């Protein structure tokens, strides 16, 4: 849900309402956030090896979501400060600010996925992960609807209230979700995992793993390229208010959730995973072409349909 505020509201406000250059917005909200993903693999290994207070995952998750929430609550003030004086020094400081948010987000996310692995058997892991992703889509849809209703009329004070409330709600839900999920252990021995270098070497030596990693990287990068620019695109090209562009996340979430359900329940049993993933990629390509066409036609109806189609393709992928 926090991603809706960060990548669905803040990026649009920074560009359209505050007038920051889109390159700066992309650098801060896009690069700053997603560069945090670089810590995911080494941090997962780090949390395997080191407990905090007897916990291998819980403390890392709480620390990550706390830092993320704090930065999100402060981000409207940082955005306005930067808009008043977008000097290279200020842009650099803001980049570090948003990079910390990205690192904290991926620290919490990596530890949470590791906790799921710890709590489930190999047979349970697939359904559990699928349920988590489905509920995440539900959270995006609900947050998108709620944020759009709250931002019907944009003011800076309303934006601050929205971001502060969202941060507090996310922290509260995280604490509730984590309650008694991990037992505290201090001295219990735990099997030592392979070193990070050895794990990466194993990945590099496997042709199948290399090809899959490259495919996944290219596919995810291609899909997430729209994350930073979609809402500013709706605001500048179509003249849509913040409430309407915030709903883009709802349309996308409906498409992704529908694609996951359609693929998992209907298509994969009949066509296989490779064909369904390929179908999802072609749908994403068609959706991006539709986004381009909608810009020339200035049709908001085509735009909404195309965003939903983009989510459907991503869900199948």
Residue ranges and their predicted role:
Residues 61-88, 282-298:
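C-terminal ends and interior cores of transmembrane alpha-helices
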Residues 184-213, 237:
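Juxtamembrane intracellular "pre-TM" segments in multi-pass secondary transporters
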Residues 8-24, 228-246:
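Short amphipathic helix-loop junctions that connect adjacent transmembrane helices
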Residues 1-17, 99, 204-226:
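Pair of pore-lining "gating" transmembrane helices in MFS-fold secondary transporters
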Residues 32-37, 126-151:
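Glycine-rich segments within core transmembrane alpha-helices of 12-TM secondary carriers
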Residues 274-317:
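C-terminal transmembrane helical hairpin of 12-TM major facilitator-type secondary transporters
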Residues 38-54, 151, 259-275:
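Helix-to-loop junctions at the C-terminal end of transmembrane segments
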Residues 63, 158-177:
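Symmetry-related core transmembrane helices of the 12-TM Major Facilitator Superfamily/SLC fold
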